Amino acid sequence: MSQFSFTKMHGLGNSYIYVNMFEEQIPEEDLALVAEKVSNINTGIGADGMILICPSDVAPVKMRMFNNDGSEGKSCGNGLRCVAKYAYEHKLVEDTVFTIETLAGIVTAEVTVEEGKVTLAKIDMGAPRLTRAEIPMLGEGETPFIRENFLYNNHRYAFTAVSMGNPHAVIFVDDVDQAPLTTLGPVLETHEMFPERVNVEFIEILNEEEMNFRVWERGSGVTQACGTGACAAVVASILNGKMERGKEITVHLAGGDLMIAWTEEGNVLMKGPAEVICRGVYEYKIEA
């Protein structure tokens, strides 16, 4: 029987099991199965996945993120805010501004601290990737994939594709609560045009500075929030002329609000909370 200490944290209800790999050890070959086991709501702790906080050669810390199906993702906005909170509060970093390595690249985090506790985290998510090759999508073309039609159940849905280090398909609807989240979501997620699968967001524009947001996450299904998805939604809204670049946009997710801005300089900034749920020790056994 093996075990490790964990901290369960969430960003707007998007929860992960966080493991400090400066102190703990999980064999590389076991990571996918452990992520699947620990995320199980019935036989594990229950979460949207597992995130490892690891040493890095190029930043103070490195984030590795696993979905609840065991697949490894390249980035996670809500996860990055929680990693930033954990790293500062556990003295893995000293400054309130620091970098985090991800599989999608290095991002910059800035934490707001009150009485020694991080109350808010802002992440510079870098520039969005907009071409088919960068997203990635099948097909040729170096222009952005904006408002292209997808036929489902005899209804045409127009979506815009954006990568924030992971792929997103953003669909505008009149009412997110009536959107085909659990039906169209998995169909588009696993469509052959996305070789690495895709996260699917449904967006309802409220005004020039606010939107409602629902998400079907690649490898996890319906979640309360998706930070990279919120960033992709704002980028897609600006590309479609629905919002203005440079302004801070309030994204209303099922789990709460994020503040997102696509700056004139090109990077996307995400600001929001990160909270600890519980801490403990998880025991597991890998069958031979």
From Swiss-Prot:
A Pfam family annotated for this UniProt entry: DAP_epimerase
Enzyme Commission number: 5.1.1.7
Subunit annotation: Homodimer.
UniProt protein name: Diaminopimelate epimerase
SUPFAM superfamilies in alphabetical order: Diaminopimelate epimerase-like
Catalytic activity: (2S,6S)-2,6-diaminopimelate = meso-2,6-diaminopimelate
Residues at the catalytic site: C76 (proton donor), C226 (proton acceptor)
Native species: Bacillus cereus (strain ATCC 10987 / NRS 248)
GO cellular component: cytosol
EC primary class: isomerase
Protein's pathway: Amino-acid biosynthesis; L-lysine biosynthesis via DAP pathway; DL-2,6-diaminopimelate from LL-2,6-diaminopimelate: step 1/1
